């Protein structure tokens, strides 16, 4: 289940936008603290891109 909480990020076009990720997951090596990654869709170009999510974002 995807949690749709909007976060403020920078799009590949260089603009700041407040978007909700379509998918979110944790990326971590064995035995280490990982980072949270979100899959976003650029509203201007329609292309998908990945961006780091805040640590307090529920996955």
UniProtKB/Swiss-Prot annotation:
- A single GO molecular function term of this UniProt record: double-stranded DNA binding
Location within or outside the cell: Chromosome; Cytoplasm
Alphabetized Pfam families for the sequence:
Cren7
Q: How is it modified after translation?
A: Methylated at multiple sites, to varying extents.
Listed under GO cellular component are: chromosome; cytoplasm
Asked if the Swiss-Prot or TrEMBL record annotates the protein with the keyword DNA-binding, the reply is yes
Please list which residues make up the signal peptide: none
Tell me how this protein assembles. Answer: Monomer.
Q: Which family does it belong to?
A: Belongs to the Cren7 family.
Q: What is this protein called?
A: Chromatin protein Cren7
Which gene codes for it? creN7
């Amino acid at each position: 289940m995807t949690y749709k909480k909007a976060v403020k990020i920078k799009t590949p076009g260089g603009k700041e936008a407040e978007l909700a990720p379509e998918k979110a997951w944790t990326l971590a090596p064995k035995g280490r603290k990982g980072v949270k990654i979100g899959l976003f869709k650029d509203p201007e170009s329609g292309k998908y891109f990945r961006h780091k999510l805040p640590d307090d974002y529920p996955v």
